[in-house]
Protein backbone atom coordinates (compact mmCIF):
# COMPACT_ATOMS: atom_id res chain seq x y z
CA UNK A 1 0.00 0.00 0.00
CA UNK A 2 2.81 2.47 0.87
CA UNK A 3 5.67 0.78 -0.95
CA UNK A 4 6.01 3.53 -3.56
CA UNK A 5 6.18 6.19 -0.84
CA UNK A 6 8.79 4.16 1.05
CA UNK A 7 10.93 3.72 -2.07
CA UNK A 8 10.57 7.40 -2.95
CA UNK A 9 11.66 8.52 0.53
CA UNK A 10 14.67 6.21 0.55
CA UNK A 11 15.66 7.22 -2.98
CA UNK A 12 15.46 10.91 -2.08
CA UNK A 13 17.61 10.27 1.00
CA UNK A 14 20.15 8.38 -1.11
CA UNK A 15 20.20 11.16 -3.72
CA UNK A 16 20.82 13.77 -1.02
CA UNK A 17 23.68 11.73 0.42
CA UNK A 18 25.20 11.09 -3.02
CA UNK A 19 25.07 14.80 -3.91
CA UNK A 20 26.77 15.66 -0.60
CA UNK A 21 29.34 12.91 -1.10
CA UNK A 22 30.19 14.03 -4.64
CA UNK A 23 31.59 17.37 -3.41
CA UNK A 24 35.17 16.86 -2.21
CA UNK A 25 34.94 20.09 -0.22
CA UNK A 26 32.52 18.33 2.13
CA UNK A 27 34.97 15.49 2.73
CA UNK A 28 37.77 17.98 3.44
CA UNK A 29 35.54 20.01 5.78
CA UNK A 30 34.63 16.93 7.82
CA UNK A 31 38.32 16.08 8.20
CA UNK A 32 39.18 19.66 9.23
CA UNK A 33 36.37 19.66 11.79
CA UNK A 34 37.51 16.36 13.32
CA UNK A 35 41.12 17.52 13.61
CA UNK A 36 40.03 20.89 15.06
CA UNK A 37 37.95 19.10 17.72
CA UNK A 38 40.68 16.60 18.59
CA UNK A 39 43.27 19.38 18.81
CA UNK A 40 41.00 21.28 21.20
CA UNK A 41 40.61 18.20 23.42
CA UNK A 42 44.37 17.55 23.39
CA UNK A 43 44.97 21.16 24.50
CA UNK A 44 42.49 20.91 27.39
CA UNK A 45 39.53 22.54 25.64
CA UNK A 46 35.93 21.43 25.40
CA UNK A 47 33.12 21.57 22.86
CA UNK A 48 29.71 23.18 23.33
CA UNK A 49 26.94 22.17 20.93
CA UNK A 50 23.57 23.70 20.13
CA UNK A 51 20.65 23.48 17.75
CA UNK A 52 16.87 23.82 17.61
CA UNK A 53 14.26 21.06 17.37
CA UNK A 54 15.73 17.99 15.67
CA UNK A 55 19.07 19.78 15.46
CA UNK A 56 18.93 20.22 19.24
CA UNK A 57 18.60 16.44 19.53
CA UNK A 58 21.57 16.06 17.18
CA UNK A 59 23.59 18.48 19.35
CA UNK A 60 22.77 16.34 22.38
CA UNK A 61 23.62 13.14 20.50
CA UNK A 62 26.97 14.67 19.50
CA UNK A 63 27.87 15.56 23.11
CA UNK A 64 26.65 12.22 24.47
CA UNK A 65 28.86 10.22 22.14
CA UNK A 66 31.87 12.33 23.12
CA UNK A 67 31.35 12.03 26.87
CA UNK A 68 30.07 8.45 26.70
CA UNK A 69 31.25 6.40 23.78
CA UNK A 70 30.79 5.80 20.09
CA UNK A 71 31.88 2.34 18.95
CA UNK A 72 34.74 1.58 21.30
CA UNK A 73 35.40 2.10 24.99
CA UNK A 74 37.76 5.02 25.55
CA UNK A 75 38.09 8.00 27.87
CA UNK A 76 35.29 10.54 27.62
CA UNK A 77 35.95 13.85 25.91
CA UNK A 78 34.66 17.14 27.37
CA UNK A 79 31.44 18.06 25.57
CA UNK A 80 28.32 19.90 26.67
CA UNK A 81 25.09 20.19 24.73
CA UNK A 82 23.40 23.43 25.71
CA UNK A 83 20.19 21.74 26.74
CA UNK A 84 19.56 22.48 30.43
CA UNK A 85 15.83 23.18 30.61
CA UNK A 86 16.11 25.61 33.52
CA UNK A 87 18.75 27.63 31.63
CA UNK A 88 16.74 27.60 28.41
CA UNK A 89 13.52 28.69 30.12
CA UNK A 90 15.23 31.33 32.27
CA UNK A 91 17.03 32.97 29.37
CA UNK A 92 13.99 32.69 27.09
CA UNK A 93 11.85 34.40 29.70
CA UNK A 94 14.32 37.05 30.82
CA UNK A 95 16.20 37.85 27.59
CA UNK A 96 14.38 36.14 24.71
CA UNK A 97 14.86 32.88 22.87
CA UNK A 98 17.48 34.39 20.56
CA UNK A 99 19.89 34.42 23.54
CA UNK A 100 19.43 30.92 24.97
CA UNK A 101 22.70 29.60 23.55
CA UNK A 102 24.83 32.76 23.51
CA UNK A 103 24.32 33.39 27.23
CA UNK A 104 25.59 29.89 27.97
CA UNK A 105 28.58 30.34 25.65
CA UNK A 106 29.42 33.63 27.39
CA UNK A 107 29.27 31.93 30.79
CA UNK A 108 31.09 28.69 30.02
CA UNK A 109 33.09 29.11 26.79
CA UNK A 110 36.72 30.16 26.67
CA UNK A 111 39.56 30.47 24.20
CA UNK A 112 40.62 26.99 23.14
CA UNK A 113 37.05 25.67 23.19
CA UNK A 114 34.92 24.86 20.15
CA UNK A 115 31.27 25.61 19.40
CA UNK A 116 29.34 23.22 17.16
CA UNK A 117 26.22 25.00 15.91
CA UNK A 118 23.58 23.16 13.92
CA UNK A 119 21.01 24.94 11.76
CA UNK A 120 19.42 23.30 8.72
CA UNK A 121 18.59 26.71 7.26
CA UNK A 122 21.68 28.53 8.50
CA UNK A 123 19.34 31.30 9.62
CA UNK A 124 18.57 30.45 13.25
CA UNK A 125 19.04 33.71 15.15
CA UNK A 126 19.95 31.97 18.40
CA UNK A 127 22.65 29.89 16.69
CA UNK A 128 24.07 32.98 14.98
CA UNK A 129 24.21 34.78 18.33
CA UNK A 130 25.96 31.74 19.83
CA UNK A 131 28.54 31.91 17.03
CA UNK A 132 29.07 35.61 17.72
CA UNK A 133 29.49 34.92 21.44
CA UNK A 134 31.94 32.11 20.71
CA UNK A 135 34.01 34.42 18.54
CA UNK A 136 34.04 37.04 21.31
CA UNK A 137 35.33 34.36 23.72
CA UNK A 138 38.12 33.36 21.30
CA UNK A 139 36.53 30.00 20.51
CA UNK A 140 36.65 28.12 17.21
CA UNK A 141 33.34 27.43 15.44
CA UNK A 142 32.08 24.49 13.42
CA UNK A 143 28.72 24.90 11.67
CA UNK A 144 26.51 22.15 10.32
CA UNK A 145 24.11 23.87 7.93
CA UNK A 146 21.98 23.19 4.90
CA UNK A 147 20.57 24.79 1.77
CA UNK A 148 22.86 27.73 0.85
CA UNK A 149 24.24 28.18 4.38
CA UNK A 150 21.91 31.10 5.05
CA UNK A 151 23.16 33.88 7.30
CA UNK A 152 25.74 31.50 8.80
CA UNK A 153 27.60 31.32 5.48
CA UNK A 154 31.18 32.39 6.17
CA UNK A 155 30.81 32.70 9.97
CA UNK A 156 32.47 29.43 10.98
CA UNK A 157 36.04 28.18 10.92
CA UNK A 158 34.61 25.04 9.33
CA UNK A 159 31.18 24.85 7.71
CA UNK A 160 29.75 21.51 6.67
CA UNK A 161 26.79 22.34 4.44
CA UNK A 162 24.19 19.97 3.01
CA UNK A 163 23.02 21.64 -0.23
CA UNK A 164 19.45 20.35 -0.06
CA UNK A 165 16.55 22.77 -0.55
CA UNK A 166 13.67 20.44 0.29
CA UNK A 167 12.54 19.37 3.72
CA UNK A 168 14.88 19.82 6.70
CA UNK A 169 14.78 16.12 7.60
CA UNK A 170 17.01 15.27 4.64
CA UNK A 171 19.60 17.75 5.90
CA UNK A 172 19.34 16.33 9.42
CA UNK A 173 19.92 12.82 8.07
CA UNK A 174 23.25 13.94 6.62
CA UNK A 175 24.10 15.90 9.77
CA UNK A 176 23.76 12.79 11.95
CA UNK A 177 25.94 10.83 9.52
CA UNK A 178 28.54 13.61 9.69
CA UNK A 179 28.37 13.52 13.49
CA UNK A 180 29.05 9.79 13.47
CA UNK A 181 31.99 10.23 11.10
CA UNK A 182 33.35 13.01 13.34
CA UNK A 183 33.22 10.59 16.29
CA UNK A 184 35.15 7.96 14.37
CA UNK A 185 37.81 10.43 13.22
CA UNK A 186 38.15 12.13 16.62
CA UNK A 187 38.75 8.75 18.24
CA UNK A 188 41.46 7.97 15.67
CA UNK A 189 43.04 11.41 16.01
CA UNK A 190 43.12 11.24 19.82
CA UNK A 191 45.33 8.15 19.85
CA UNK A 192 47.88 9.50 17.34
UniProtKB/Swiss-Prot annotation:
Record-level GO BP terms: carbohydrate metabolic process; D-glycero-D-manno-heptose 7-phosphate biosynthetic process
Obligatory cofactor(s): Zn(2+)
Keyword Magnesium attributed: no
Cofactor notes: Binds 1 zinc ion per subunit.
Domain SIS: 37-192
Reactions the enzyme catalyzes: 2 D-sedoheptulose 7-phosphate = D-glycero-alpha-D-manno-heptose 7-phosphate + D-glycero-beta-D-manno-heptose 7-phosphate
Binding of substrate, residues: 52-54, 65, 93-94, 119-121, 124, 172
Pathway(s) annotated for this protein in UniProt: Carbohydrate biosynthesis; D-glycero-D-manno-heptose 7-phosphate biosynthesis; D-glycero-alpha-D-manno-heptose 7-phosphate and D-glycero-beta-D-manno-heptose 7-phosphate from sedoheptulose 7-phosphate: step 1/1
Cellular component aspect of the GO annotation: cytoplasm
InterPro entries reported in the protein's UniProt record: GmhA/DiaA (IPR035461), Phosphoheptose_Isoase (IPR004515), SIS_dom (IPR001347), SIS_dom_sf (IPR046348), SIS_GmhA/DiaA_subfam (IPR050099)
EC number: 5.3.1.28
CDD domains: SIS_GmhA
Miscellaneous comment text of the record: The reaction produces a racemic mixture of D-glycero-alpha-D-manno-heptose 7-phosphate and D-glycero-beta-D-manno-heptose 7-phosphate.
PANTHER family membership: PHOSPHOHEPTOSE ISOMERASE (PTHR30390:SF7), SEDOHEPTULOSE 7-PHOSPHATE ISOMERASE / DNAA INITIATOR-ASSOCIATING FACTOR FOR REPLICATION INITIATION (PTHR30390)
Assembly notes: Homotetramer.
Similarity comment: Belongs to the SIS family. GmhA subfamily.
Function: Catalyzes the isomerization of sedoheptulose 7-phosphate in D-glycero-D-manno-heptose 7-phosphate.
Protein name: Phosphoheptose isomerase
Species: Erwinia tasmaniensis (strain DSM 17950 / CFBP 7177 / CIP 109463 / NCPPB 4357 / Et1/99)
Chain's gene name: gmhA
